[in-house]
Amino acid sequence: QQSDIAEIVVPRSPDSHKGSHGTIAIVTGSSQMAGAALMAAHGAVRSGAGKVFLRVPGKVGPYCIGVQPEVMVKSVGTGDCFTADDAESIIAESNHWSVLAMGPGMGRDDGTRDFLKRVLEQVTCPVVLDADALNLLAGEKEFLSAIGHRLIVTPHLAEFSRLSGFSLDEIKDDLIGRARAFAADWKVNLVLKGAPTLIVSAKTGNVYVNPTGNAGMACGGMGDILTGMIAAMTAHQGMSDLCSAACAGVYLHGAAGDACRKDRGPYGFTPMETADAVPSVLADLEKNLALPILQQPLIGGK
């Protein structure tokens, strides 16, 4: 509920700066799906990230540079998709990042799988994994569980089936049970996207059911926006843990979609428009919070 999210998305300190609100790295994309990378970056920007870096394969860079001036884009390597040879430059940069997001539009090339695993083995920051990152790591239980404490994985039902090995029927027959079992077994924080979306804590096994969102959000790209939003929430000043960040990102994403539905109706609003609604949703959330003493207005000059 909104009151739960208000407790974990704390107001910005008046003396904060861009470094206080996290350095988000979106490392993803391929020549056929540059838009997915751009949408993930946009989701992070609109959710209040202090700085957003976008790292894309060499041939993708020209399609991304300058599209959103707030996003700092750099090409990595020379190909249409990431390869194992590209991993070292990402690993070297990762020491400066608060959180890393990977997967949207990444493609399923074998070289990209090698790249992904090399990066995940070496980085130490929290990581949000979505889309093709999950498809590439399907069945890699031993690998993922070894680093699961710093992961948030965000599959929809089909991706969850490929990743976990559960059939779609098994998942639908016991959604909460399968989600909880997976998070415990694989030792990851899980966002199982659907209607409703479930969030499961790797630490406690607690399951949270998101109340926001609507059928107008059932279109390509919404998950990419969510990836960026969860990454931004992970780096939000005062955020206590990865599961809380996932809950906040999912709730705000759905609430932004609900705002779009209210303004435009249930048809045709876009993922980018949904991201653009997030600042207003956050502003509404903040109105219901007590202001810290430094942000309270002075009355009578005292």
What spans do the regions from the language model cover?
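Small-residue (G/A/S/T)-rich helix-start motifs and N-terminal tracts that mark the onset
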Residues: 1-127, 135-152, 157-302
